[in-house]
């Protein structure tokens, strides 16, 4: 008798695919929808050439808006796969990943749709960039220089004027590590 041990990864489904398929679900599902907040984050990354790479989408552990971007990128990429190749391909990718000898999402994607995950990512990236360039063309021709009142934090939200109009109260994750950790800030307009 010979005893042998082989290191086999227990989880091969990357976060973008797990979260993206959970949010997409299936055709005509109406539980979780693409919304303006998700779109704003992804649009900003796309037009500023700062999209998460295919490899970066495969992990959490980022600070600020980075983890949120893994969710948003995964949801959008799963929608892209469903719209471009058919929603059945998402299921096929997951089935491919369930094989005991399949350790690569890149290969599982190639087996399902005929191109590697990296090639798919480049198609997705081009589609995003082209789409957002078209949508922002008129905006870009009328850009104004804003007066930035605070440049800390990745989430500065829910601004509210004081009754006398001299202060702005808002919540921000400035001085915190995560998107969900916010404090109340008061900005004095004076």
What are these regions (language model features)?
Residues 1-91, 95-143, 147:
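Acidic/His/Gly-enriched intrinsically disordered linker/tail segments
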């Amino acid at each position: 008798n010979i005893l042998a041990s082989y290191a086999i990864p227990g989880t091969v489904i990357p976060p973008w695919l797990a979260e993206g398929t959970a949010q997409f679900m299936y055709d005509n599902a109406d539980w979780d929808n693409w919304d303006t907040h998700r779109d704003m984050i992804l649009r900003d990354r796309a037009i500023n050439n700062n999209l998460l790479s295919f490899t970066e989408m495969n992990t959490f552990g980022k600070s600020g808006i980075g983890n949120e971007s893994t969710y948003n990128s995964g949801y959008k990429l799963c929608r892209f796969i469903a719209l471009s190749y058919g929603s059945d391909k998402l299921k096929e990718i997951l089935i491919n990943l369930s094989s005991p000898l399949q350790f690569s999402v890149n290969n599982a994607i190639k087996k399902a749709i005929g191109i590697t995950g990296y090639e798919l990512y480049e198609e997705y990236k081009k589609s995003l960039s082209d789409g957002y360039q078209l949508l922002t063309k008129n905006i870009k021709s009328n850009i104004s220089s804003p007066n930035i009142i605070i440049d800390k934090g990745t989430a500065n939200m829910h601004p509210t004027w004081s009754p006398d109009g001299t202060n702005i109260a808002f919540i921000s994750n400035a001085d915190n590590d995560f998107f969900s950790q916010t404090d109340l800030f008061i900005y004095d307009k004076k």
